[in-house]
């Protein structure tokens, strides 16, 4: 199972994620309590080995903002959490994760407009997009409508429920942020526990 640890701001947290087998490291460039600058992410990325993908999280970015981060960090993947048009996703010089909020168990009508992107399902936004720590209603999702090799599950995951999410959705990857935090800060022990559980290692 591919595991993405998102919202990292400190070198010690990046190290904890990498050392315990994270496959993707997420840096949040959108307005958030986890927001970092391109320069900050660039410094953190120096400690990420080549086999671990660096992901930048954005909400309705300009082309210039995307390009600056892709080149400046550099990023392997951009994660789009706003109302970005499919045209923007399709011409981005990186792999793309397109995030969709799941409201009332319904998938958005435009979910198929991004054929080349990974599709991330998340709980509806609160003050900021993503990182709310809440799950969406897993029971109402028609899994037959989802392409599993492109599917990423997020929203309210933790070490206690991630295996159930994997069994239900058989996703390509799982994505976590607040579920590996204690008092609003990344917790290295929770990072370790989540990764080991998601990958099925005791």
From Swiss-Prot:
Q: Cross-referenced PANTHER family, in alphabetical order?
A: N-(5'-PHOSPHORIBOSYL)ANTHRANILATE ISOMERASE (PTHR42894:SF1)
Q: Which GO terms describe its biological process?
A: L-tryptophan biosynthetic process
Judged by the first EC level, this protein's enzyme class is isomerase
Q: What is its EC number?
A: 5.3.1.24
Which SUPFAM superfamilies has this protein been placed in? Answer: Ribulose-phoshate binding barrel
Q: In which pathway does it act?
A: Amino-acid biosynthesis; L-tryptophan biosynthesis; L-tryptophan from chorismate: step 3/5
Record GO terms (molecular function): phosphoribosylanthranilate isomerase activity
Catalytic activity, per the record? N-(5-phospho-beta-D-ribosyl)anthranilate = 1-(2-carboxyphenylamino)-1-deoxy-D-ribulose 5-phosphate
Q: Which family does it belong to?
A: Belongs to the TrpF family.
Q: Which UniProt keywords apply?
A: Amino-acid biosynthesis, Aromatic amino acid biosynthesis, Isomerase, Tryptophan biosynthesis
Give me the gene this protein comes from. Answer: trpF
What CDD domains is this protein classified in? Answer: PRAI
Q: Which species expresses this protein natively? A: Listeria monocytogenes serovar 1/2a (strain ATCC BAA-679 / EGD-e)
Name by which UniProt lists this protein: N-(5'-phosphoribosyl)anthranilate isomerase
Q: Which InterPro entries match?
A: Aldolase_TIM, PRAI_dom, RibuloseP-bd_barrel, TrpF_fam
What's a Pfam family in this record? PRAI
């Amino acid at each position: 199972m591919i595991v993405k640890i998102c919202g990292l701001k400190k070198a010690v947290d990046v190290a904890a994620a990498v050392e315990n087998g994270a496959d993707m490291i997420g840096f949040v460039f959108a307005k958030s309590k986890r927001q970092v600058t391109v320069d900050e992410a660039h410094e953190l990325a120096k400690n990420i080995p080549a086999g671990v993908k660096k992901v930048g999280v954005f909400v309705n970015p300009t082309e210039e903002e995307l390009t600056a981060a892709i080149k400046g960090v550099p990023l392997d993947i951009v994660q789009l959490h706003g109302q970005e048009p499919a045209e923007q996703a399709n011409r981005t010089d990186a792999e793309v994760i397109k995030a969709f909020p799941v409201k009332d168990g319904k998938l958005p009508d435009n979910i198929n407009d991004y054929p080349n992107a990974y599709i991330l399902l998340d709980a509806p936004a609160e003050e900021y997009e993503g990182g709310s720590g809440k799950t969406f209603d897993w029971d109402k999702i028609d899994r037959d409508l989802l392409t599993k090799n492109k599917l990423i599950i997020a929203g309210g995951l933790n070490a206690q429920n991630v295996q159930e999410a994997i069994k239900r959705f058989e996703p390509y990857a799982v994505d976590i942020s607040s579920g590996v935090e204690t008092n609003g800060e990344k917790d290295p022990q929770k990072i370790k526990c989540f990764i080991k559980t998601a990958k099925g290692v005791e």
